[in-house]
Amino acid sequence: MQENCSLFVATLLHSATNTHFFHWTTDSFSKHMALGEYYDGIVEVTDAFAEAYMGKYGKFTSFPSVYHQPKEPVKYLESLQAFVADARQDLPQDSELQNLIDEIADLINTTTYKLKFLK
């Protein structure tokens, strides 16, 4: 379970970096703002998840070294939606941790909405 959690946390922290790159390179003000809200928010909620997990199950001992830099923000956020949905079942089922995963999913979903539909 710890390996699944460390991959989950690492992927989400990498998403902050990736969306920061998109934030800097977009020509759209609405996308610029949505991506900025995302990378600020995802670090905070990922940190909350990691600390809650470690408080209950112990410290992480390793993290994956793989890093992927995506090319297109909407497709990337949609892939994060699928990642969180798939990973959820392999993560601890404690309600407090699942609630934090809900917050993560909510942030990804609202950012995807803003990128797709707000101009």
Where are these regions (language model features)?
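Short, charged, low-complexity loops and linkers
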Residues: 1-4, 61-68
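Helix-loop segments that flank and shape redox-cofactor active sites
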Residues: 14-36
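Non-transmembrane amphipathic alpha-helical segments
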Residues: 19, 49, 84-87
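Amphipathic alpha-helical coiled-coil segments
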Residues: 48-53, 111-119
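Conserved alpha-helical segments that form or flank metal/cofactor-binding pockets of metalloenzymes
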Residues: 32-60
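Disorder-to-helix initiation segments
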Residues: 1-9, 15, 73
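Residue-level recognition of alpha-helical structural elements
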Residues: 8, 31, 93-97
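Acidic/histidine-rich alpha-helical segments that form the ligand environment
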Residues: 65-116
